[in-house]
Amino acid sequence: MQKKRVVIIGSGPAGFAAALYTARAQLKPVLIAGNALGGQVSQTHEIENYLGFESLSGMELVQKFQSHVEHFGAQVVYDAVTEVDFTKGSPFTVKTHGETYLADTVIVTIGADPRKLKVPGEAEYIGRGVSYCGTCDGFFFRGKDVVVVGGGDSALEESLFLTRFANSVNIIHRRDTLRAGVQLQSRAKKNEKISFTWNTVVEEILGGDDGSVRAVRLKNVQTGEVYEKPTDGVFIFIGHVPNSQIFAGQLATNDNGYIITDQRYRTNVDGVFAAGEIQDEIWRQVITSAGQGAAAGMSAIHWLEEHEDELQPLEEAVQET
Ligand code: NAP
């Protein structure tokens, strides 16, 4: 059992930014990294839109985040949270595979994952033609032909963004009606680079001899016809899945499972904060998540200042339990 002033759950940009701010406030935060250090960022081939860096890989950025926070006294733990108890108020219990933490404040930055198609070839070609982020990877498809899977706002917004680079963007949707808002629909339908393939699902993503995507195998769900469509890239926008299941029944979420926070990144539990993609279903950028994490870190610092008189010394609290 360890008692901490601040426990941060998640090692994406929001988590590291929260760690930086709370570490520089001398709070010695512990950041529980989860199963994949850096989350979605570490899987990003190249990042060109994080301020101050013209180009670096996601993994490089995560390593910089880690050495920065450790320099100021944050502790990064390679472990995953298995259970939390926020029901009795602060201090909260956070259990990992290897440790139990008693935390005066908790900052939840556990992120969301792009929903996967779960078809053969998808996992294999991530970063080699398969992408879940047009803003991150569109630039690498200049003059290329790409397909986009999905029919919601993200699919259309990202398709429009991709037309800045790609020669053509074909939107593959499983129905013949788009879920996206009418304005986006109208902009997409007017764009000469965008075409639609209706009532169609991707059955497989196929690679070429060079190890990158060369085609998709499609199935028309109405006629049953199966055929190959050559493409240089497959952008998948079929929604995100926030990793909020572990907090079910404790932290309030919206209908899509995103944790609800106020402008100070406070959740419904006093002393528990959330930042980044676990509570933001709109922006999903490294830079915006980092900003939100910094703000959540500052909110936790303020919370600890306001409750200074009630906080138990760290050693005493552990002996009592
Ligand atoms: P979404 O609205 O849930 O749309 C997901 C799309 O993917 C739907 O068209 C869905 O098809 C399709 N889909 C889901 N699972 C699939 C599967 N296994 N195979 C093939 N297709 C599948 O997700 P989103 O577009 O990411 O949007 C999420 C939220 O963010 C929404 O509330 C949206 O309004 C908001 N958002 C807003 C903006 C904006 O306002 N500018 C931009 C982006 C996102 P069906 O239609 O058949 O269900």
For the regions a protein language model found, what residue spans apply to each?
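FAD-site-proximal beta/loop scaffold in flavoenzymes
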Residues: 118, 124-140, 236-288, 292, ...
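FAD-binding core/adjacent interface of flavoenzyme oxidoreductases
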Residues: 1-9, 25, 30, 76-144, ...
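Predominantly flavin-linked oxidoreductase catalytic cores and closely associated redox partners
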Residues: 99-196, 205-211
